[in-house]
Amino acid sequence: MGSQSDYKIMHLAEKILKKIGVPFETKIISAHRTPKRMYDYAAVTKKNNIGVIIAGAGGSAHLPGMISALTSLPVLGVPIESKKLKGLDSLLSIVQMPKGIPVGTLAIGEDGAINAALYAASIISTFDDTVKNNLNKWRSKQSKSVKKKPK
């Protein structure tokens, strides 16, 4: 994520990843304030056996796109709501990538963080049967939680 303030949203992705049993790491990496940290991180992602990157950022939100430019791993971008433009600035920064630098862009805020974790788990489930089983259980539980009739 781009800053400490993004954690109030991105911790929701952690919760889902924990429930589904996807190993993860959480770091603060700002594309603007810590560019060397960003380059160094991107350089070791494959070596460190990372399969998917979830990058949450607010404002100009260049982190997901820059990480995508520096690695061939799937990058999922979560726009974080900003005070001035309600996250529209973040969304447009992440979704409007030039051809050849893909970022899977999710919804602004909490729903985006949760769906990014589920999407990352879906990607990992293509080669990890434990994650696949846990993800299927999570989805089944979610389906069962929906009432058939209103109270």
Which residues fall in each region the model found?
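Short glycine/serine/threonine-rich phosphate/pyrophosphate-binding segments
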Residues: 6-11, 35-38, 57-66, 85-88, ...
